[in-house]
Structures are given as structure tokens and as C-alpha cells.
């Protein structure tokens, strides 16, 4: 009964005219940036953060959430029609989706992706409604030492699940933690790492870093390597799957939904892991495994359901623990802090309308996405054909205006440009910026909880090992780090044996 009452509160909040409009705007923008390869939800949300200052908290968060899960829908469109994934989570969809399109079944492939995404998004949101409240209740029992250990685990998980070199990921985390230290120490009043620059006394702006690393950095990278989009499937007919198609897509959609919902909670790239894992499992157990890579409908249904389910459940750590599971969730935490909301388990009790309004808006948003993705497919095809060289200058101007509007300080524009160049350099060096952003968000919070824990324990560092929850979390972090190091150590051992021979 309590769940029904909470959902009623959520529907009452989400079904206001303004929130419906912002939900529609969010999923529309999400679909748009998903359709355009190179423009991801991270860059888009980073660019829109300044706008959230002027919006009510619930409306702003509903819109930003819609951009995130809406981009998963849009990413499948380019995967199927152009063989270019709009989102990283849609990479697997290209394998069979594009082949279906070349066989004249583009409409069926698009409908399959939309239906699987809608089902997965709806079910995953139900999981969020069921499991988020108990987890939030558990989190209320956490002390400062437990929160510190939880954040250590989150950073270690981000390192373990990051793409590329483990050493690079650790380096990016350290850089993020150092950036979080810049500014005035709230306890001593002394400036740290400001190098005599007055504009750094308040610290490095989160929006400046996010816009630079993910917005401007992506623009530079994509202008250097503009994707060739010559083979675009424009003839689309017969959207409805056949009876045989329905049979073949049913179980892959169900399995992808469950798998994606579970992996979406993991820090890092849960939705990406979910789509790859779902595709691999279906390829192994399917009766039609020989058709995979040649236009199997299971190869579209499974990854699309998995990545959309993962996008929904990635909100669980954010709404219950205040821990971001991916860069987009880190930006969502930034948006909440901008609105004066302290992310964490207290949100469900102190602002239940906000908590349940966001959850219910996801159901509404998934319904909007089905309407946007199928009837308007002709419009998305025309948008795909817009050259980047015309699109990105407008985005660059928008970034500069957005950053300047926060404080009316010209220095922030130069700083954004600096982080844009750094983001581009990091990409060229195969250093994923996501762990840096997570560490930049969590660093000041970790420092705060570390000081509280040491103050309450009178300077006794063993408090982190004496508390059961904290000790368990630190043990898990250590195990994750050890497991991630084993392959590298094994590889070096093999290389040493080869040199001896």
C-alpha cells in the first residue's frame, strides 16, 4: 500500500503540465543527440547544466534524466540505418540491425529496437521503484566512515571497469581528486593549489570541467575524424514485425531486460556491459546462432533491451546512495547540488515528490519515446545527414554562452577551452575522462566524510576497519583491485618467459 501511495504522489508530480513538457523536451533532445554520432548525453547534459539554474528542481532533473535514457533510443536509429552507433551502448546493434536494413527490413529493425527498449525501460523503472526505497533505508544506517569506504569502492569500480589501461584509469582518478582539492579549505580558510589566481579561490567549476572535457573535447575529436555517412538506408516500410519475429524477439527481450537491469547498477559503463553481454548470451543459446551478424532479429532485441534497462537502473545508486554509477549520473549529482539538493538516502524522506516524480517520469518518458522514434523516423533520417562542420560551431557558441552565464566571468571560458584541449589529448592518449569526472565529484565528499570519521573517532584510523559496513566495502574494493591486476601480472609473466626462451 505504501508503494501505491508513493507512486500516486509521483504521478501527481510528474503529470503537471510543466513537468510533462520538460519530460517531452528531455526525451526529444535525448533522441536527437543519440541520432547524431559524436554527440553523447554526457556532453549534452554538461552543456545544459547552466539552464537548470532557472528551472524548478524536479523539472530540471526530469529533463536531464529524459536526455540520458532518450539517447539510448536514438542511438539505435543510426546503428540500424547508417551502421554507425549513435551511442557506445548501441555498438552491438549495428551487427544485425544494419544487415536487416540492407535486406529491406529497416522498419522491422527500428520497431524491434523501439519495442524492446520500451518494454525494458518500463520493467527496469519498476525495479527502480521496488528496490530503491529499501536500499535508501539501509543507506540511512551509514556513518561517515561507511560513506567514505563506499566512495572508495565506487572509484575502484570505475577504475576496474574503465576502458584501456588500468594505470591510465588510476591516473585519471588521481587527477580528478587533485582538481577537487583546488580552492579554499572550508575548515582552515586557506587557499589550496590556486597559484595566486583569484578566480580559483572558489574551486574549479564543475560545469566548466564537464563542458570542456565532454563537450568541447568531443567536438575537436569528431571534427578531426568526421564519420563518413555515405550509405544511409532511407527507404523504410513495414514497421510491424511478423508473428515469427514476435516469437523470436520475446525471450531475448526478457533476458536482455533482466541482465541489463542488474548490470546497470554497476559503476562504470553498466549499460554498455549489458548490451555486449546480452548479445553474447543470445548468440550462444539461440537456435538461429548462424544468422547472428547477418540480420538476426534477436541481435537487435537483446542488446537494445539491455542497454535501456541499464540506463534506468543506473539511477538506483544516485537516488539511494548519492553515488554516481557513470559520468551522466555524476552530472546529475552536479545538477542536484546546483539546486541545493544533497544527493543521498535522505532525498526519499525529505523530498519524496522529487524522488517519486523522477521515477514516474521515466514511465511517461518511455511512452513519449515510442511516439517520437517510429512515426518521426523520416525526420531523424534527414537529421543524420547534417554535416558536423555545420552543427558543431553552433554547439561551441552555446557552450561559451552557457559557461559565461554562470558567473559572468570571462576566465571560465578560457578554462573551459583548456579542459576541452585536455579532453582531446586524453582521448588521443587512450585515457578515458569518465573516471576523472567521477573522482572530481566524489573527491570533496570523500574529504568531508574522512574528516568527520576521524573527528568522531578522535583520530583513530582503525575506525574504517572496526565498523562492519566500512570494512566490508573496503574489502570488496581491495578484491576488485586485485582481480583487475591479475591479467596484467599474468601477461607480464608470459612476456618474461618468452624473453628467457
Ranges and model annotations:
Residues 27-41, 71-83, 158-163, 257-267, ...:
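Transmembrane alpha-helix interface/packing and boundary motifs in multi-pass membrane proteins
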Residues 1-60, 133, 139-140, 191-296, ...:
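Helix-loop-helix hairpins and the membrane-proximal interhelical loops
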Residues 47, 80-109, 134, 143, ...:
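Flexible loop linkers connecting adjacent transmembrane helices
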Residues 111-227, 338-492:
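Membrane-embedded alpha-helical modules
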Residues 293, 495-501:
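Short, charged juxtamembrane terminal tails flanking transmembrane helices
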Amino acid at each position: 500500500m505504501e508503494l501505491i501511495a508513493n507512486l500516486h504522489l509521483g504521478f501527481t508530480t510528474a503529470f503537471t503540465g510543466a513537468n510533462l513538457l520538460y519530460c517531452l523536451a528531455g526525451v526529444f533532445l535525448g533522441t536527437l543527440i543519440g541520432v547524431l554520432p559524436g554527440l553523447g548525453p554526457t556532453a549534452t547534459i554538461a552543456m545544459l547544466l547552466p539552464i537548470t539554474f532557472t528551472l524548478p528542481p524536479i523539472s530540471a532533473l526530469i529533463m536531464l534524466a529524459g536526455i540520458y535514457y532518450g539517447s539510448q533510443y536514438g542511438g539505435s536509429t543510426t546503428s540500424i540505418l547508417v551502421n554507425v552507433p549513435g551511442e557506445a551502448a548501441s555498438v552491438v546493434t549495428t551487427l544485425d540491425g544494419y544487415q536487416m536494413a540492407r535486406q529491406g527490413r529497416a522498419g522491422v529493425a527500428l520497431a524491434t529496437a523501439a519495442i524492446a527498449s520500451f518494454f525494458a525501460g518500463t520493467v527496469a523503472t519498476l525495479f527502480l521503484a521496488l528496490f530503491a526505497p529499501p536500499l535508501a533505508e539501509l543507506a540511512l544506517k551509514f556513518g561517515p566512515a561507511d560513506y567514505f569506504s563506499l566512495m572508495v569502492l565506487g572509484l575502484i569500480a570505475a577504475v576496474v571497469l574503465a576502458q584501456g589501461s588500468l594505470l591510465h584509469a588510476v591516473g585519471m582518478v588521481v587527477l580528478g581528486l587533485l582538481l577537487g582539492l583546488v580552492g579554499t579549505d572550508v575548515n582552515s580558510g586557506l587557499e589550496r593549489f590556486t597559484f595566486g589566481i583569484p578566480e580559483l579561490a572558489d574551486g574549479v567549476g564543475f560545469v566548466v570541467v564537464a563542458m570542456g572535457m565532454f563537450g568541447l573535447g568531443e567536438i575537436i575529436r569528431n571534427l578531426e575524424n568526421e564519420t563518413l555517412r555515405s550509405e544511409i538506408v532511407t527507404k523504410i516500410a513495414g514497421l510491424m514485425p511478423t508473428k515469427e519475429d514476435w516469437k523470436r524477439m520475446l525471450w531475448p527481450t526478457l533476458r536482455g531486460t533482466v541482465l541489463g537491469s542488474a548490470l546497470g547498477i554497476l559503476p562504470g559503463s553498466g549499460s554498455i556491459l549489458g548490451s555486449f553481454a546480452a548479445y553474447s548470451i543470445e548468440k550462444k543459446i539461440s537456435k538461429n546462432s548462424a544468422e547472428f551478424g547477418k540480420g538476426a532479429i534477436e541481435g537487435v532485441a537483446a542488446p537494445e533491451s539491455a542497454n535501456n534497462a541499464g540506463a534506468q537502473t543506473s539511477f538506483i545508486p544516485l537516488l539511494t546512495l548519492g553515488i554516481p554509477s557513470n559520468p551522466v549520473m555524476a552530472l546529475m549529482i552536479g545538477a542536484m547540488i546546483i539546486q541545493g539538493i544533497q544527493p543521498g538516502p535522505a532525498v526519499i524522506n525529505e523530498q519524496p515528490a522529487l524522488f517519486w516524480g523522477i521515477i514516474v517520469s521515466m514511465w511517461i518518458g518511455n511512452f513519449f519515446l515510442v511516439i517520437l522514434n517510429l512515426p518521426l523516423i523520416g525526420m531523424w533520417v534527414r537529421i543524420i545527414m547534417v554535416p558536423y562542420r555545420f552543427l558543431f560551431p553552433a554547439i561551441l557558441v552555446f557552450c561559451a554562452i552557457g559557461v559565461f552565464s554562470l558567473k559572468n566571468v570571462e576566465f571560465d571560458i578560457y578554462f573551459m577551452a583548456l579542459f576541452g584541449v585536455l579532453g582531446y589529448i586524453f582521448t588521443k592518449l587512450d585515457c578515458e575522462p569518465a573516471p576523472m569526472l567521477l573522482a572530481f565529484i566524489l573527491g570533496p565528499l570523500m574529504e568531508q566524510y574522512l574528516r568527520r570519521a576521524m573527528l568522531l573517532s578522535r583520530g583513530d584510523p582503525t575506525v574504517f576497519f572496526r565498523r562492519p559496513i566500512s570494512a566490508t566495502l573496503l574489502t570488496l574494493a581491495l578484491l576488485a583491485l586485485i582481480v583487475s591486476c591479475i591479467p596484467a601480472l599474468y601477461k607480464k609473466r608470459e612476456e618474461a618467459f618468452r624473453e628467457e626462451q
